[in-house]
Swiss-Prot record:
Binding-site residues for Zn(2+) 1, renumbered to this chain: 85, 177, 206
Binding site for D-glyceraldehyde 3-phosphate: 49
UniProt GO molecular function: fructose-bisphosphate aldolase activity; zinc ion binding
Family classification: Belongs to the class II fructose-bisphosphate aldolase family.
Cofactor(s) demanded: Zn(2+)
GO CC annotation, single: cytosol
Main enzyme class: lyase
Keywords, in A-Z order: Glycolysis, Lyase, Metal-binding, Zinc
Active site: 84
Protein name per the record: Fructose-bisphosphate aldolase
Pathway participation: Carbohydrate degradation; glycolysis; D-glyceraldehyde 3-phosphate and glycerone phosphate from D-glucose: step 4/4
Cofactor-binding details, from the entry: Binds 2 Zn(2+) ions per subunit. One is catalytic and the other provides a structural contribution.
Catalyzed reactions per annotation: beta-D-fructose 1,6-bisphosphate = D-glyceraldehyde 3-phosphate + dihydroxyacetone phosphate
Length: 288
């Protein structure tokens, strides 16, 4: 059964830990993420971007896939199925299809338009008991074609968006999607603390891959309650595929090394291992 993330983030905020949000890209990803969460007894947010949703052939595939895996793997922990960086229309479609949570990314819009669409979306989400994450200040890097420069969120705008009472707030705090460049300035900790105090909302750290562990832990102590991970899982997956191919295992005809199930076994385990590392970094182990 899918749940919204309202209660899990409220508990995380009180307990000063975070909930891992892991983007999935296919069947192996979904299975690995749910396996890790169940193994660690951790609540989990299974997330899909619009691009991944299209790649996986849409809502009619993704929702039954996740629900089916929850049942077949006997997953006992709370699971949220979340649309990541959705447009207004995509969020409505996701809610109608059965997602238990959506993130409306209106950060690239004029603030008034972002505010008004956010307000309408929250009203719609309440009808299906779904959670809503909103964004103020564009996150750096690229996410499904949307490019942000890593700007810092306007505190007054954060306060206004918080008045809508979303379940989580993603604010630009110097974070970047993808691999962090060597000249990255780092997270703006004073801004995280300020936004947390004035909004009293669970805050979200997008672009969580590649940030120093101590910095992530400090951010969590200041109010980050949801850590978004994608790139690190992709890198771990690709690394294991490269190892398999470069060792010529795919050319072993006697052992049927060309079997995709054998090719994907270690890469899938690498996602499980990465998720377990992030669960421990977040402090969500045994918090289900």
């Amino acid at each position: 059964m899918l749940v919204n993330f309202k209660l899990m983030l409220q508990k995380a905020k009180l307990g000063k830990y975070a909930i891992p949000h892991i983007n999935i890209n296919n069947y192996e990803w979904a299975k690995a993420v749910l396996t890790a969460a169940n193994q660690a007894n951790s609540p989990i947010i299974v997330s899909v971007s619009e691009g991944a949703l299209k790649y996986m052939s849409g809502y009619s595939v993704v929702i039954p896939l996740v629900k089916g895996l929850i049942e077949s793997l006997s997953v006992k922990v709370p699971v949220t199925l979340h649309l990541d960086h959705g447009s207004y229309d995509a969020c409505i479609q996701a809610l109608q299809a059965g997602f238990s949570s959506v993130m409306f990314d209106g950060s690239h819009l004029p603030f008034e338009e972002n505010f008004n669409k956010s307000k309408k979306l929250i009203e719609i989400a309440q009808k299906t008991n779904a959670s809503v994450e909103l964004e103020v200040g564009t996150i750096g890097g690229e996410e499904d074609g949307v490019i942000g420069q890593g700007e810092l969120a306007n505190v007054d705008e954060c306060k206004q968006i918080a008045s809508l009472k979303p379940d989580a707030l993603a604010a630009g705090i110097g974070n970047i999607h993808g691999i962090y460049p060597k000249n990255w300035k780092g997270l703006n900790f004073p801004l995280i603390e300020t936004i947390s105090k004035i909004t009293n909302l669970p805050l979200v750290l997008h672009g969580g891959s590649g940030i120093l562990e101590n910095d992530v832990k400090k951010a969590i102590s200041l109010g980050i309650c949801k850590l978004n991970i994608n790139t690190e899982c992709q890198l771990a997956f690709a690394h294991e595929i490269r190892k398999y191919i470069e060792s010529n295992k795919d050319l072993d005809l006697n052992k049927k090394g060309y079997d995709p199930r054998k090719l994907l076994k270690e890469p899938t385990q690498a996602i499980v291992d990465t998720c377990l590392e992030k669960i421990d970094l977040c402090g969500s182990r045994n918090k289900a």
